[in-house]
């Protein structure tokens, strides 16, 4: 238990530079098409520059859904099209996710689906978001947890993709971080309220 606590604490205190540098600009958001059932409508593309048994992706997704830590993550090796079984979410919250996965097969791009769902289909479908499946090999998981935050190979964020434009979160459903909200409040502490106008081409859904 003590080792697990120290590993989690290390992960919390060692954020990559991208954590502070990421700005949610349009260039990071795109559209594509895939079969959504079991994968969901949203994914991040990350790139690993060298094969590694433990790769770590920092994904600043800025999600508005509640309890993202209760929803699963699916990682797909783009070059093979196969799912990666060895996946371990390190830290999941609405602002970002830190995910470790096995990239020993090859370097290159990986899809990270972060809102996978199952639907019953039909005119009144029931949709559920399954929790993280425990498919990781126990030995890999132990190695993964023993790897210090600074020693895992960092996967670089390429961009986010949605299933077509209708499902895109950008820009109106990309949340502000707690730090950004507090900075806005502090900069306008002498004002009774703030009015933030937006172009009508960006409706609130």
Describe these PLM feature segments.
Residues 7-16:
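Bacterial N-terminal signal peptides
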Residues 1-4:
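Positively charged n-region of N-terminal signal peptides that target proteins for export
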């Amino acid at each position: 238990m003590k080792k697990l606590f120290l590993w989690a604490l290390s992960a919390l205190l060692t954020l990559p530079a991208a954590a502070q540098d990421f700005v949610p600009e349009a260039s990071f958001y795109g559209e594509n098409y895939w079969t959504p059932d079991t994968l969901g409508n949203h994914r991040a593309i990350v790139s690993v520059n060298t094969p590694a048994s433990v790769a770590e992706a920092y994904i600043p997704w800025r999600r508005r859904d509640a309890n993202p830590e209760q929803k699963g993550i699916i990682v797909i090796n783009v070059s093979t099209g196969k799912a990666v079984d060895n996946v371990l979410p390190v830290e999941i919250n609405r602002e970002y996710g830190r995910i470790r996965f096995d990239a020993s097969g090859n370097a290159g791009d990986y899809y990270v689906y972060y809102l996978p769902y199952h639907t019953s289909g039909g005119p009144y479908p029931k949709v559920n978001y399954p929790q993280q499946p425990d498919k990781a090999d126990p030995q890999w998981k132990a190695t993964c947890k023993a790897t210090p935050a600074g020693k895992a190979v960092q996967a670089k964020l390429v961009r986010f993709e949605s299933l077509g434009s209708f499902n895109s979160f950008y820009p109106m459903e990309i949340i502000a971080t707690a730090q950004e909200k507090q900075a806005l409040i502090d900069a306008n502490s002498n004002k009774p309220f703030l009015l933030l106008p937006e172009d009508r081409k960006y409706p609130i859904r």
